[in-house]
């Protein structure tokens, strides 16, 4: 994957971003992400910093940037970075967020980060119910659940779900766990966000049984219909089978690992 840099942006657009954010220093590259967009951090005159991401307007992923901006405009205050600015001009889509000083959590067995993450996930949904983003699609239309049609009712709900809770979309800072990158948000039942975390725990080294024990600490997951969770495990595994060979190399490698985790989870659920 060829990652674009700050210098790839037109000079006029760079000045617009700098002025709008009241930046006081150079744009420093930020590593990470599965997209080829620009990712930089910029110091501001208020003593804080902004995280800026940008992608050409013609890129297939530009729509996700626009969706992420639209969702963030509706989110209530909470454990997530504030949207500071958005620009859709000069053939680029640019988003600027409050920079969160923190680290990605360790989800491995025995990690002290695990209870922090689980508590944060449990607290995430009440402020997002009812769903504040009117254009959020129901999760029953997500490609993950194509094989789980008999369990659509258990997946329905009016909570805004993150739908991509992974270690790299979480930051632990001075004020707890923050959820970043809301581009895939859907509307549905709160247990789904927890179910999506289960394969991530398996990827981090947990057995499927242990991963489910941790997930069950969240009431929404503990109270979810057992057969719906099993159908979901099967569906997400099928989804990764279909997607394992797609995307940029980094994403393909992740999806192949996720597929192994999904198969282990499905086998455990159907034992």
Feature map (PLM): residue ranges:
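Helix-rich C-terminal or lid/interface subdomains of diverse kinases
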Residues: 196-271
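Regulatory N- and C-terminal appendages and interdomain linkers associated
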Residues: 1-21, 257-271
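Active-site Asp-x-Gly
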Residues: 159, 173-213
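Conserved catalytic-loop position in the HRD/HxD motif
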Residues: 164, 169, 181
């Amino acid at each position: 994957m060829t990652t674009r840099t700050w210098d790839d942006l037109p000079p006029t657009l760079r000045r617009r971003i700098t002025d709008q954010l009241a930046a006081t220093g150079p744009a420093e590259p930020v590593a990470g992400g599965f997209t080829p967009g620009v990712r930089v951090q910029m110091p501001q005159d208020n003593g804080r910093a902004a995280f800026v991401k940008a992608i050409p307007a013609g890129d297939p992923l530009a729509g996700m940037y626009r969706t992420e901006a639209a969702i963030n405009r509706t989110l209530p205050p909470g454990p997530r970075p504030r949207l500071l600015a958005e620009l859709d001009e000069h053939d680029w889509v640019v988003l600027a967020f409050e920079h969160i000083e923190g680290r990605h959590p360790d989800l491995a067995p025995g990690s002290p980060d695990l209870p922090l993450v689980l508590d944060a996930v449990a607290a995430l949904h009440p402020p997002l119910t009812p769903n504040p983003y009117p254009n959020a699609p129901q999760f029953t239309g997500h490609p993950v659940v194509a094989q789980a049609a008999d369990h659509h009712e258990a997946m329905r709900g009016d909570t805004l779900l993150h739908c991509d809770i992974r270690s790299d979309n979480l930051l632990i800072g001075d004020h707890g766990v923050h959820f970043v990158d809301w581009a895939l948000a859907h509307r549905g039942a709160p247990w789904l966000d927890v179910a999506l975390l289960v394969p991530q725990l398996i990827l981090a080294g947990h057995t499927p049984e242990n991963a489910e024990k941790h997930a069950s600490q969240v009431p929404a997951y503990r109270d979810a219909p057992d057969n719906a969770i099993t159908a979901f495990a099967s569906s997400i595994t099928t989804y990764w089978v279909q997607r394992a060979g797609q995307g940029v190399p980094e994403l393909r490698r992740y999806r192949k690992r996720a597929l192994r985790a999904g198969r282990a989870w499905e086998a455990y659920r159907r034992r």
